Amino acid sequence: MRKVFETVVGLNPNFSFRGKQQTRIETFSDAVFALAITLLVLSSTIPETFEDLWASMRDVIPFAICVALIIVIWYQHYIFFLKYGLQDKVTILLNTILLFVLLVYVYPLKFLARFLSEIYGGIFGIIETDLSRFGEYSHQNLKLLMVNYGLGAFAIFLVFSLMYWRAYKMKSLLDLNSYEIFDTKSSIIANLLMCSVPLLSLIITLIDPWGNFRTTILSGFLYFLYVPIMIVFGRITSKKSRRLLQD
Amino acid sequence: MRKVFETVVGLNPNFSFRGKQQTRIETFSDAVFALAITLLVLSSTIPETFEDLWASMRDVIPFAICVALIIVIWYQHYIFFLKYGLQDKVTILLNTILLFVLLVYVYPLKFLARFLSEIYGGIFGIIETDLSRFGEYSHQNLKLLMVNYGLGAFAIFLVFSLMYWRAYKMKSLLDLNSYEIFDTKSSIIANLLMCSVPLLSLIITLIDPWGNFRTTILSGFLYFLYVPIMIVFGRITSKKSRRLLQD
Amino acid sequence: MRKVFETVVGLNPNFSFRGKQQTRIETFSDAVFALAITLLVLSSTIPETFEDLWASMRDVIPFAICVALIIVIWYQHYIFFLKYGLQDKVTILLNTILLFVLLVYVYPLKFLARFLSEIYGGIFGIIETDLSRFGEYSHQNLKLLMVNYGLGAFAIFLVFSLMYWRAYKMKSLLDLNSYEIFDTKSSIIANLLMCSVPLLSLIITLIDPWGNFRTTILSGFLYFLYVPIMIVFGRITSKKSRRLLQD
Amino acid sequence: MRKVFETVVGLNPNFSFRGKQQTRIETFSDAVFALAITLLVLSSTIPETFEDLWASMRDVIPFAICVALIIVIWYQHYIFFLKYGLQDKVTILLNTILLFVLLVYVYPLKFLARFLSEIYGGIFGIIETDLSRFGEYSHQNLKLLMVNYGLGAFAIFLVFSLMYWRAYKMKSLLDLNSYEIFDTKSSIIANLLMCSVPLLSLIITLIDPWGNFRTTILSGFLYFLYVPIMIVFGRITSKKSRRLLQD
């Protein structure tokens, strides 16, 4: 049954899960995650007329982007607690900060997703872009936007790296074997790497080399660095972990 | 105790459940389903006067229709995870899409239920129909309405069929016996059949043979096809499964 | 450990619980109950000024009445599923109706509690009664109020009696002993008795013997019948159950 | 495994937990706590323009204060039920009162945190203080504010002390050893001490020795007494518990 459980969860069966029994921290966190995605979608006005109904359908793409991002964070949270089952005060404190940052960024994320959908909708000719509804669309505001989301993304992944660092600190008590220790260290580094991209974007935005939209466009596109970083890092770690498992 | 559990759940005792232990995906999904039915009912304005109170009671029938539909989807979700207990990334992705479609359609469903209740309330002489509060009641808007809900229903049942297809793909790992494999394949086909009705309705609406209300009335009544389809399909599968169990 | 569990739950240790393992129906229902009491309190406007803050505190008593009523219903729900652990389609259908009636009555309950608090607050000289904010305060509206809440209370306890009736029907499958069968039958009758009071109040209101406020005052005070009914019924059943346990 | 569980929970491994299996009271309470912190953050208006977005970011500090306070209460709730696993009627009643007080104070807490942030933001020169948006900022209103929050804090910790008193009353049934009895008695006293500070603040506010802002400033700063009280009390109890464990 052990092999089936690990595999049906799609996780690496070489890691023995300490957190199969759901704890209250996870039940509480699941309720907050569920509230976040639900209120993101259902905090809009209720369509009373046909016109309202079609207007509300315009938000489907932005909502899809936001829900996907939140679920990615939920999945990281789910894997962490499945692996270690930690419930100590430090983990609860870090978990609270994670949930707080998530909640603070639900509505700003909705704003950003609508804003980007309006821009890309126009670029791909799907809709007629009307950015005026977002208020004063200035370079200063775009810079603040990038700083705002850079801080949010940075905080989320920093907290995850601290949570994995916490698990690493309790490695003897959790009785982690050498493979599991390596896996934990890789998670710390992976999340620190995920932190570094928004940090870089933040720095570029604050330096603001061109003093105009080019800065914010660059700091926006920097987020595509996630793809190569994760591919390269994934290759390095999987090579090492295969060697560890053979030993 | 095994026989009692299967039977108290009202499920076919020949299927051994892999998902008796609740997982976080189910806890998270239950919170979203609970939010969906609650916000559907409680997102209306709070009655401050007697007049508000009676006006709010007018929504009871539309709400009952919506809550019943959402619970039918919840029950399908409940049975799927009880049967297979899957928690891998693909299942989580499909589950996220299912919850997202559900949330996007909560308010539109409320609109549709109110709109249909207004029409049928008038036909049965219960209330004086006043469709003006729904905005411009044109053939074009009704067509968009049918397309909108056709897509929603199509998406929900397509995701369920993909989830059962996922379970079918993991049949050796889940150690499904021949009866359970047959049951899983039947579920894939059942959900594909459930997909086909809204698809048919969508196509009729887009072709719009009459160019007036007759098209939307026909595409609406097509949904009654569910009854004969499910009865016939149910008979076929139960005959085959009895034969399988005897063998 | 068995004795401790029953006793820490404060339940009659002679009844062996079939539902100790939480099911998804209970997790889903708990989320709806939690949403009901939370939205009842938090659906008010957010205090932005000191004046708003004091105005919001005026609602504490009405909210306390509503939350107490909802928790009484939650406790009944909790005991039922703890006793029988049923998860079949009929139980899920009855549970859905129960949750639906609960949700439909959250805001009307808030209205009624505010209305009664305004009246009794004035009678006891705590506040200056101002019923004008509730709209047209006529005999006709009060009658509708009594009919409205009579139907709600009647529906809640009727569903509970049907749920216990369902458990009674599955007594052999649930392997209930004679004491447990007696306990289940008592629960059916108790809930039917709880149904009878709102039914009586409804009938009196519809007959409306005096054609003025005296009718609604009488149909309101009929609810105090709950106390003697439950005391007398409690005595009868505990006598019989003691005899059953001795045999 | 026992030692690991206690330690990963960060609790004193000398206390054997009776409540490892999550009960419905905890699932229900977790949903209410999750709703409290989510609605606290997400009950604000949704930012539609850049200006709204920056205005909404101004609330981050006040929200952080409120979420931290609510999580401290959640942690106390979590530890209580983990230790004793009680589910009897008295515990459910006390738990309901706790959740009710929590819900009633979510919005007032949001008001207080915004108010204090405005004042301290001005003192530390971070923002330009504008207290006019809070309505009439008089000595009378500040007194009512201190009374209001004094009652809330008093009620929360009084309920916790009653819950621990309930566990103490069931010590033989829960089979508590001498160390666990001492730990339970300490929790009663600790919560009564936590009650005493808001009580003292309340009394000072009602006596109102200076008849001006000095009274409310004093009654506000009294809350800093929590720190020395908890340090001294912590030292006394840990000395006694070490001696008990040695015996």
Swiss-Prot record, chains A, B, C, D:
The keyword Ion transport applies. Its main location: membrane. It is found in: Cell membrane. Disulfide bonds: none annotated. Coiled coil: none annotated. One of its GO terms (biological process) is protein homotetramerization. It is a multi-pass membrane protein. One of its GO terms (molecular function) is potassium ion leak channel activity. Changing T38A: Decreased selectivity for potassium ion. The record marks L42 as: Hydrophobic filter residue 3. GO terms for cellular component: plasma membrane. InterPro entries: TMEM175-like. The chain crosses the membrane at residues 23-44, 56-78, 89-117, 142-165, 187-210, 215-237. It comes from the Bacteria. Keywords: Cell membrane, Ion channel, Ion transport, Membrane, Potassium, Potassium channel, Potassium transport, Transmembrane, Transmembrane helix, Transport. Potassium channel; forms a potassium-permeable leak-like channel with weak selectivity for potassium. The channel is permeable for K(+), Rb(+) and Cs(+). Belongs to the TMEM175 family. Homotetramer. This is Potassium channel Ftrac_2467. The lineage of its organism: Bacteria, Pseudomonadati, Bacteroidota, Cytophagia, Cytophagales.
